[in-house]
Curated annotation (Swiss-Prot):
It comes from Shouchella clausii (strain KSM-K16). This is Small ribosomal subunit protein uS15. One of the primary rRNA binding proteins, it binds directly to 16S rRNA where it helps nucleate assembly of the platform of the 30S subunit by binding and bridging several RNA helices of the 16S rRNA. Disulfide bonds: none annotated. Pfam families: Ribosomal_S15. The gene is rpsO.
Amino acid sequence: MALTQERKNELIAEFKTHETDTGSPEVQVAILTEQINTLNDHLRTHKKDHHSRRGLLKMVGQRRNLLTYLRNKDVTRYRNLVDKLGLRR
């Protein structure tokens, strides 16, 4: 259920804005999206896992805040990220 280090490194390499980038909003949103998708699949089979559902809602809220920050700061980066991840916005 947790994101492996290899997959996290792949996401960082794909969405980084410069060579040593690990904490830009793009990277954080990409990692959160991957975790949200994994947790969503888990909750489809385990419908009564309310602890994980609460964690999912917290992650979705955190991603929403990061996307709002990015949209206010730089609209083109925001649009590129949403298109690349296939998010509804």
